[in-house]
Amino acid sequence: MSETKQLLLSEYTPMSELILKETIVSKPKYDVIDVHTHFGLIGFNGDYRNQYDTRRSVESLREAGVKKVVNLDGMWGNELDRMLEKIKPCEDFFITFGTVDTSRLDEKGFETYVRNTLKESKEKGIKGLKFLKDVSLVIKDSQDRYIPIDDQRLKVIWETAAELKLPVLIHIGDPVAFFKPIDPFNERYDELQHRPQWSFCKPGIFTFEQLMEMQENLLKNNPDTTFIIAHGGSYTENLACVGEWLDKYPNMNVDIAARI
């Protein structure tokens, strides 16, 4: 009997022997509205204006059965103008969401800035708001503290969104494993070895449990604001819990965009 070679886990790439009938689904049974897309700064990490042809991209999506998309990269001000100009050839295909600059949180007149920006953006055509996980996990205030998503200083955003009837799509939490040590017990060990910057298991950063508590506070304290909690309601590892939230908070919706 030949001696078995020791194999590192990182070298293990097995090929499945499972034989199945191949079924190619070229189009969905029903028209699709993709509520989580990025056609601007977030999606292309910089100047997107020459990185895709709007007409060709839309044609490709329509052929695949996509009826409309929610473009979450509207931003605000001049950037919103650039985004709207980019998608103008097919503007009926796009539902664009904007946002505000939360890094200005501690500036004098922040509340006035938020109200004016959102009103101006709505007049330009945005249909909702988008907020990244940066609010709780990246951006810090003037006291060098991370900003809880349920922070009272952000209240003006949710109130104005309700007044203007703008739904808020918000990314709050990442996969639970991203908040745990990168060790042999972490189910995303291989992924985090390749992308260590995705780990939030660091001193001073909110835990996953704290973020979920903030998320509930946000929903509970702003009943007139319609929220779409991105990526399966922040907690795809526990859909029973997400289901309880959906039953408990009528203003909560979820999207099913992947967080890969």
Range-by-range predicted roles:
Residues 50-58, 78-81, 111-116, 150-154, ...:
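Well-ordered, non-membrane alpha-helical segments in soluble/globular domains
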Residues 2-13, 51-52, 58, 209-260:
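H/E-rich (His + Asp/Glu) clusters that bind or coordinate divalent metals
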Residues 6-10, 14, 78-198, 253, ...:
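Active-site gating/metal-coordination segments in enzymes
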Residues 196-209:
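A short acidic, glycine-rich active-site loop
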Residues 31-37, 68-71, 95-99, 129-131, ...:
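Hydrophobic faces of well-ordered beta-strands that scaffold small-molecule active sites
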Residues 44-48, 81-83, 179-187, 237-248:
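Histidine/acidic-residue-rich catalytic or RNA/ligand-binding cores of hydrolases
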Residues 1-85:
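An N-terminally biased module of ancient metal coordination in phosphate/nucleic-acid-related enzymes
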